[in-house]
From Swiss-Prot:
Gene: xol-1
Biased composition (Acidic residues): 391-403
Name of protein: XO lethal protein 1
Record organism: Caenorhabditis elegans
Gene deletion effect: Worms are XO-lethal, due to inappropriate activating dosage compensation where only 1 X chromosome is present. In contrast xol-1 overexpression is XX-lethal, deactivating the dosage compensation pathway and elevating the expression of X chromosome genes to lethal levels in hermaphrodites.
Upregulating conditions: Down-regulated by at least 4 X-linked genes, termed X-signal elements including fox-1 and sex-1. High levels of xol-1 in males correlate with low sdc-2 expression, preventing dosage compensation. Conversely, low levels of xol-1 in hermaphrodites correlate with high sdc-2 expression and the assembly of the dosage compensation complex on the X chromosome.
């Protein structure tokens, strides 16, 4: 439903559903399973990006289960049984990528391979964690499989061969392999051999990082990112600044996320999606009204929001965020999901001993109804505040003073090193 810019609407919460699940435990076989000793499970974390220049491994895991079904070298990768891929328009393309990767691993057995949860937070098929989890799974059964450095070379060749659009792929690979319980993985500085990452410990103690997605956000999109060395340095410093309790908020991670987001929606060489711009307007207004919302970054597939620690469990705040987004949207929103992102470990083989170290996935989904406001009605139900849709000008977004990161225009691709 298209909504006129000057209309007022009633946004009603029809239902709110909180859930917590542990996919790793769900797919982990027990010792009572007769196939337990013949099957291996590996996990590789999905990632989210910040300011187009930093990557965090999160608790959402891509899982691969493999079992040797023939103890001989395969004649070709077509002999491997690959199952449980999500149904989408590019099934055969994905299978070709996987089989090309498997060929280069030079396996000595024929396997039955199952993939679980290969979609990232935005709903896109995430090739990097799929390949890394597959490699980790094969490590448990193969005696002379490639090491990590050769793995990176193989992955880069596959990405190049199939012309996959994965911005800053080397930083994504590093985050997936190493995890982010200690570091955010920043794109490498040109010509520098120094560790360019920032520490995540204090950020994690102070903030809830939440990925918000509406039913209007696309899942099949070509990622457009604008990494730069300047933004990379600011982001690294911002993470390190979180360590000092007396640091001014305007040089911490949430502030730089917000400034970057403001700049992104009006960047001349970027075609901003309608849902991105509307979300930007909604979150800016919300930040002015609720101190629990500390910062945000509008992205193509959703919104990365930094809340005060433990605010994710405040149903009233979650409702306010959902209603604000629905109110400012020019298209009618019918659902909003919230995923609590916890810092995830690096890729690993899953065993009974370590399966409990994987954080559960916490999610909230709100069903929403949007209708025109009748005389005497308020514009929202489910919270105490009222929200009205107002006409706005895109140029107004940039009138406020920006943090330094929003003024950087030098771009840098760490994959070109």
């Amino acid at each position: 439903m298209q909504v006129e810019a000057n209309s007022e609407r009633r946004v009603k919460i029809l239902g709110i559903d909180r859930s917590e699940n542990s996919p790793v435990l769900t797919y982990m076989e027990t010792e009572d399973d007769p196939n337990f000793r013949n099957s291996k499970l590996a996990a590789a974390p999905h990632t989210v990006h910040m300011m187009d220049s930093g990557f965090l491994a999160i608790n959402r895991q891509c899982l691969v289960k493999g079992k040797a079904i023939l103890a001989r070298e395969p004649k070709s990768s077509n002999e491997h049984m690959i199952d449980d891929l999500p149904k989408h328009a590019h099934d055969q393309h994905t299978l070709s990528i996987l089989r090309d990767f498997i060929d280069q691993l030079k396996l000595h057995n024929v396997y039955e391979i199952n993939f679980y949860d290969p979609l990232d937070s935005s709903g896109k098929l995430a090739v990097i964690p799929m390949l890394i989890a597959l490699w980790k799974c094969m490590l448990a059964s193969e005696t002379d499989i490639c090491d990590q450095e050769v793995l990176k070379s193989i992955m880069n060749s596959v990405i190049a061969k199939f012309e996959l659009q994965i911005p800053c792929k080397n930083a994504v690979i590093d985050a997936t392999l190493s995890g982010s319980r200690e570091e955010v993985h920043i794109i490498a500085e040109d010509g520098s051999l120094e560790n360019s990452n920032g520490t995540t410990e204090h950020f994690n103690k102070k903030h809830d990082l939440v990925f918000v997605k509406t039913d209007l956000h696309p899942e099949d999109f070509t990622p457009q990112m604008f990494p730069s060395q300047a933004k990379a340095k600011l982001l690294r410093d911002a993470f390190n600044n979180e360590e000092d309790e007396d640091t001014f908020p305007d040089i911490l991670v949430p502030a730089y996320m917000t400034a970057h987001s403001k700049n992104r929606v009006r960047q001349e060489d970027y075609t901003c999606l309608e849902v991105e711009f509307d979300s930007q307007v909604a979150l800016e207004k919300l930040m002015n009204e609720h101190e629990q919302v500390e910062g945000f970054e509008v992205q193509q597939g959703g919104i990365l929001v930094a809340l005060k620690k433990d605010s994710f469990f405040d149903d009233e705040l979650i409702e306010k965020i959902a209603i604000a987004i629905a109110t400012e949207s020019r298209q009618s929103v019918s659902s909003v999901s919230f995923d609590l992102l916890k810092l995830g470990p690096g890729a690993s083989l899953v065993t009974l001993a370590n399966s409990r170290r994987f954080e559960p996935e916490c999610r909230v989904v709100l069903q929403i109804e949007v209708k025109p406001v009748s005389p005497g009605e308020t514009s929202s139900e489910g919270i105490s505040d009222e929200h009205h849709y107002e006409e706005y000008d895109e140029d107004d977004i940039m009138e406020e003073e920006e943090a330094p990161s929003a003024r950087q225009d030098d771009t840098y691709d760490e994959d070109e090193e």
